[in-house]
Amino acid sequence: MVAQSTKYDHLFSNLIPNSIDGIKIFGMDDDYIKPQIYDDVTNLENRIWSELYQNLELLLNQYASREYLLGLKTLPIPNNMFPNFKEISPLIENATGWTLLPVAGFLDEELFFDINKKRQFPVTDIIRRSPRFDEKYSEMEIQNKKGYTPEPDIFHDVQAHVPFLMNADYAEFIWKVGVLGDEIIKDKRMLGPDLISHNLKRLQNFAWWTYEYGLVKNNGTSDRFRRVPNDIDYEIYGAGIISSLDEVNNVVDCAKERSPNSKFLPYDIEEMALTCFDYTHIQDRYYIVESMDGLYDSFKKNKELFFFEGQ
């Protein structure tokens, strides 16, 4: 695990101490690989999956991005039972070269980026509000609601993230994020531990405000893939929103001005990298990128932002 330093935290806004505190984290030295034993999935777990999926199905069809809708359509992700990793992984590999890696839970930065640069995407087969989830967190408190949990469960990993891996441009983008994270950690520029920690926080913030909680401008061209036209100005591409009924409803309510809970801000990669996040609550802001191509291009042109050398 990368040593944590607060030396440059004064550069951040919205600073949240221990932003992922309270989640079990696995590292290189842990037994982090945990194959899915599909025959062990219980009827209760299938029912939980089904309820989560069906609660979100119509909302996501109306408000999720085109990349998500097309990816979901091509994968065997059922709405009434757990998905089988062995059925999904070969299809993704054939499409974009990525594979699924079954893991025990949340991974630390070093392990996550090492896996990512190999085009492996970590997935778990534990699900919120299940006995296995309760057992994992029997000795520590964690939010465990149907609408939201900070633990990356199978619903978040597979239902929300995995469909995007069928899109070649998106898959290349998150691979480049992984490569950059690995480069920061290996510190070939010899910046030292304080700046490694700081630059990783910048990259984590960027990832949070984009592929976890990002929105893209709705230009109307995705409606042909929907049952009901999107009636707000944005499409959802952040997996943290997609897997959370509470978060999706918040986006829609705020976009329709039924709630003042969150604000919509224009995409600004420097501001995003320097703005910390709070995983324990519904997000108070969402950044809007003009297009997915704009996101990819911005990241490509601004990598030096993640190699801050101190001041």
Functional labels for PLM-detected ranges:
Residues 103-107, 171-174, 189-191, 220-223:
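Short coil/turn segments at secondary-structure boundaries
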Residues 115, 170-173, 188, 192, ...:
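Surface-exposed beta-strand edges and their flanking turn/coil or helix-capping segments
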Residues 86, 171, 175, 201-208:
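Non-catalytic, well-ordered alpha-helical scaffold segments
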Residues 180-238:
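Extended, Lys/Arg-enriched charged tracts that mediate electrostatic binding to polyanionic substrates
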Residues 157, 171-177, 181-186:
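A structural signal for long, well-ordered, hydrophobic/aromatic- and basic-residue-enriched core segments
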Residues 2, 6, 10, 227-228, ...:
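C-terminal structured domains
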Residues 1-169, 284-311:
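The feature captures two recurrent sequence modes
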